[in-house]
């Protein structure tokens, strides 16, 4: 746990809204990252963040204090986002998103980073979510496993396949040379 985190959780359990506000401030960006990785839509992700923090607060009594709080919170956020995605898929036909590169990006490093982001965002959710959690939020395999509700071996496989797909897409765009 982050220093003072256990104390903040305990105060929140006792009804201290200022303590809960501090938890929200500490984790809102990471929860947003989890949500946008699943939903691929910033507006929906913002809604999911609010809903995730509401649900987490309502269910805080279910949190096991011996476990890592961020993993529990990211699991709540992932579940909220997945539910929103299922609901959206029932209501709307799937739409393809197009991410055009920013013409102002003249530096090669920025172009490569943009190309990598686009390649990751174009992955199917099964590969995209583990990639974002691992490489943007630096979660380990067991944490990703808990957040997504899949086995660690499945996480490992999806990360491997996700990296292979990203490499192939970057090679196809000429950003990197395809390595056997």
Can you name each region flagged by the protein language model?
Residues 24-42, 59, 120, 140, ...:
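Amphipathic, Lys/Arg- and hydrophobic-enriched alpha-helical face
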Residues 27, 48, 158-161, 165:
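Residues within the DNA-recognition helix of helix-turn-helix
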Residues 58-65, 75-95, 109, 161:
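Arg/Lys-rich amphipathic alpha helix in sigma70-family domain 2
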